[in-house]
């Protein structure tokens, strides 16, 4: 849960909060898009975390610094220059959260043996989803309730981030007492920063000289091209008034629709995608998954033209789109694993996740400007056109028919 909440706060809650505070879609997409950067470059500094302190120390310390970041956001919102101050605090949370991911993943492998890791992986994934619902759903609903009850939007969001700050202080203290101290969790001895840098350069070289590396990188960057643009504008679209082309939902309604119903659809889609791939393999399910991650984006074209008044149809549309995304995203993650196989598997997979974040960052940064230039209906039509790029990059993939099948 401590891994999911900061990421959700940086990537999703920030866009809702800034929209409610009157920031333009152009600025929201551009400046929150930059916040992907720590996850893009995370592979570059992750080896150095191994050289200093323990994974346990890093995990607990980063949680406390995340709490400080959330507190800074809370205190900045009532000021006249809240945008600059809160963005700086979000940068702190983003870099700290990315470092926390490195440490927590490493601690997981030190504290548990192979059997225990397999046993708890499902529980870990479940708690990640619960935290996502708590962040995108419950916390946004809470902020909406405070907005409605007080009429003071900055104060409502200050309280929300204050609660998140207190939560992470408590998590840091709790983990300080509860986390064990595995004997294997210690700084790497006899290895210098220069050695790590040299090994990383070798990993970097072998990554780019792998067979079909160019096609793989294009796939990592472009498979989610439509989603990279959509994700920054979905919440502003739902919050914007009808006369501005939006759906006119309240903050609390957005928390329920996108943060709860949407996450349920995403989770179910992901589970079924994993089951399907396990039975037929990635190659068999690639094109159904490509269709699943792209074609449901048509619901936003419908919503932008119809602008339905009731929540029922909006919930159905968001569920369908997020279900498709969850199902289709399975192919993406499986291909990253497939491409990473061989020497330096772990390091190559980390580099793949960097390209994954970059593929979301760059298109998303310009999405707000594009939407404000052409309007919501044409923007959503544009994302449908971008689906052709997804189909194109997948056409060049070479995949072993047996990969992903249950042995």
What do these predicted ranges mean?
Residues 284-332:
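C-terminal transmembrane helical hairpin of 12-TM major facilitator-type secondary transporters
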Residues 47, 134-155, 274-275, 362-378:
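Transmembrane alpha-helix termini and helix-breaking/packing motifs in multi-pass membrane transporters
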Residues 1-39, 214-219, 223-243:
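Helix-loop boundary and gating motifs at the non-cytosolic
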Residues 60, 64-81, 291-309:
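C-terminal ends and interior cores of transmembrane alpha-helices
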Residues 98-112, 327-341:
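Intracellular juxtamembrane helix-capping segments at the cytosolic ends
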Residues 23, 74-77, 81-85, 99-100, ...:
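Intracellular loop-helix junctions on the cytosolic face of multi-pass helical membrane proteins
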Residues 51-65, 278-292, 311:
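Cytoplasmic membrane-interface "Motif A"-like loop-to-helix N-cap segments
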Residues 41-54, 268-285, 371-372:
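Helix-to-loop junctions at the C-terminal end of transmembrane segments
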């Amino acid at each position: 849960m401590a891994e999911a909440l900061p990421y959700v706060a940086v990537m999703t809650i920030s866009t809702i909060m800034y929209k409610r505070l009157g920031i333009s879609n152009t600025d929201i997409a551009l400046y929150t898009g930059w916040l992907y950067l720590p996850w893009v470059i995370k592979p570059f500094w992750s080896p150095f975390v191994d050289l200093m302190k323990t994974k346990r120390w890093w995990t607990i310390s980063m949680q406390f610094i995340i709490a400080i970041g959330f507190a800074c956001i809370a205190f900045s919102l009532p000021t006249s220059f809240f945008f600059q101050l809160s963005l700086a605090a979000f940068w702190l949370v983003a870099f700290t959260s990315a470092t926390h991911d490195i440490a927590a993943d490493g601690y997981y492998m030190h504290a548990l043996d192979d059997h225990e890791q397999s046993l708890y992986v499902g529980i870990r994934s479940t708690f990640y989803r619960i935290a996502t619902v708590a962040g995108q759903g419950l916390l946004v609903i809470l902020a909406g309730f405070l907005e409605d009850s007080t009429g003071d939007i900055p104060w409502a969001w200050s309280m929300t981030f204050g609660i998140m700050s207190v939560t992470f202080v408590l998590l840091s203290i709790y983990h300080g007492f509860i986390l064990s101290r595995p004997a294997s969790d210690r700084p790497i001895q006899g290895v210098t920063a220069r050695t790590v840098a040299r090994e990383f350069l070798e990993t970097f070289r072998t990554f780019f000289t792998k067979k079909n590396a160019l096609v793989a990188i294009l796939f990592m960057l472009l498979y989610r091209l439509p989603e990279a643009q959509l994700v920054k504008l979905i919440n502003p679209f739902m919050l914007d008034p009808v006369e501005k082309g939006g759906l006119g939902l309240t903050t609390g309604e957005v928390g329920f629709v996108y943060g709860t119903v949407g996450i349920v659809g995403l989770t179910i889609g992901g589970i079924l995608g994993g089951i399907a791939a396990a039975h037929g393999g990635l190659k068999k399910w690639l094109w159904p998954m490509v269709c699943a991650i792209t074609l449901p984006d048509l619901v936003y074209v419908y919503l932008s033209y119809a602008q339905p008044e009731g929540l029922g149809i909006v919930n159905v549309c968001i569920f369908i789109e997020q279900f498709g995304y969850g199902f289709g995203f399975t192919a993406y993650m499986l291909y990253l694993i497939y491409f990473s196989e061989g020497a330096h598997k772990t390091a190559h997979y980390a580099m793949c996740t960097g390209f994954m974040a970059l593929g979301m960052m760059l298109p998303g940064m310009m999405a707000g400007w594009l939407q404000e230039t052409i309007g919501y209906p044409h923007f959503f039509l544009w994302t449908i056109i971008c689906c052709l790029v997804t189909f194109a990059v997948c056409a060049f993939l070479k995949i072993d028919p047996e990969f992903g099948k249950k042995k």
